[in-house]
Amino acid sequence: MRVGITKSRTCEWFNKTKRTGADFFVEDIKIRNFIEKTFPRSGISKVVVRKTAKEGEIIIFTSKIGVLMWKNWAKLKEFEDDLKKKFGKDFQVLVKEVRVPELSAKVMAEFIAQQLEARMPFRKVAKNTLQKIIEKGALGAKIQVAWRLGWTDIARVEKFIEGRVSLQTFRSDIDYFCLQAMTKYGVLGVKVWIEKWAATTKAPVTLQKKPTL
């Protein structure tokens, strides 16, 4: 919803064939799902896909660049070959580091899910995560955890807010992500909102009337 206002596009297509935009859109979703399946919980913050008719470029932004670049270097090269076999075109995969992972809603949501799956108290996890986000310069953050919290029989929703999260305007740079935490006692839903900077307000312009003679 905020693409073109505070968010840049994460997919670019250059098409000179008879393929429609829907075909490229479906292929883009398959590429992203394939990346998440190949590198699960690898601190991937964002994936940018640029495609032409014969080749493409994939830029992976991650907070754990050592996991992808060194530990999984052979797997990364194998991943490029798998992309060519699966989608029929050559892809160049680039990996870039996220300098401040605490300002990425996806990275923080994965961190919360890992803590919940390790049976850490959800209140402690949420409050510690909010503190990390605010310390890195965010204006505000909101965390929502839902379902059988604390391993109780009754499902409920708990919300934790620190600072300001203005969802009423598109001009605020708000990062959002949601996922599921697979715990021993069931599936928990995790949602994270992070406001990086506020909307800019401009003073109203007043027109001066010409004096009458």
Question: Where on the chain are the PLM-derived regions?
Answer:
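Short, charge-patterned binding micro-sites
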Residues: 49-64, 90-110
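Generic solvent-exposed, charged/amphipathic alpha-helical segments
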Residues: 32, 36, 77-84, 113, ...
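N-terminal, positively charged regions that mediate nucleic acid binding
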Residues: 1-72, 76, 187-201, 208-213
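Acidic, low-complexity central loop/insert segments
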Residues: 68-94
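Short beta-strand/turn micro-motifs at beta-sheet edges
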Residues: 45-48, 80-82, 179-180
